[in-house]
């Protein structure tokens, strides 16, 4: 639990033993272990907070779909991206595509920046 947290609110982590096979599948084992050991917690309070009006309703969206993602099913990612009318790029990558395939992710960011000026 973090300092000053309301009662019943905790920090959540992915078990280090599971992290390599779900979040970091496809990455070198040493890198996956390092990422597991240094992961930042998710406050469980975030799981019950309203997010507000989705930005994709008013601004263009881009999505990088990791087709080897073991955290969020690629079909679900694709459905969400289509719902948001996003420009979609698929890459054979795990959940951490920004680490496994930084060139692809960077290119999508650059394209989005150029398109939105």
Please report, for each region that a protein language model flagged, where it lies by residue.
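Small/polar glycine-rich anion-binding or flexible loop at a beta-alpha turn
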Residues: 54, 95-98
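Conserved short-loop catalytic and cofactor-binding motifs
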Residues: 20-23, 65, 93
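Short glycine/proline-enriched coil/turn segments at helix->beta-strand junctions
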Residues: 40, 58-59, 82-87
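Conserved loop-alpha-helix segment in the C-terminal half of the alpha/beta-hydrolase fold
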Residues: 67-92, 99, 104, 111-112
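Helix-rich cap/lid subdomain of alpha/beta-hydrolase
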Residues: 1-52
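Short beta-strand/loop motif that positions the catalytic acidic residue
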Residues: 57, 62-65, 69
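Short, hydrophobic alpha-helical segments
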Residues: 109-117
């Amino acid at each position: 639990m973090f300092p000053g947290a309301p009662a019943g609110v905790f920090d959540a982590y992915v078990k280090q033993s599971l992290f390599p096979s779900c979040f970091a599948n496809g990455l070198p084992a040493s890198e996956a272990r390092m990422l597991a050991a240094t992961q930042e917690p998710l406050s469980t309070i975030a799981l019950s907070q309203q997010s507000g009006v989705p930005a994709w309703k008013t601004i263009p969206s881009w999505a990088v779909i990791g087709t080897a993602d073991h955290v969020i099913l690629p079909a679900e990612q694709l459905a969400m991206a289509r719902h948001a009318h996003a420009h979609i790029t698929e890459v054979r990558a795990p959940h951490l595509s920004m680490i496994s395939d930084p060139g692809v992710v960077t290119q999508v960011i650059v394209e989005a920046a150029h398109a939105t000026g």
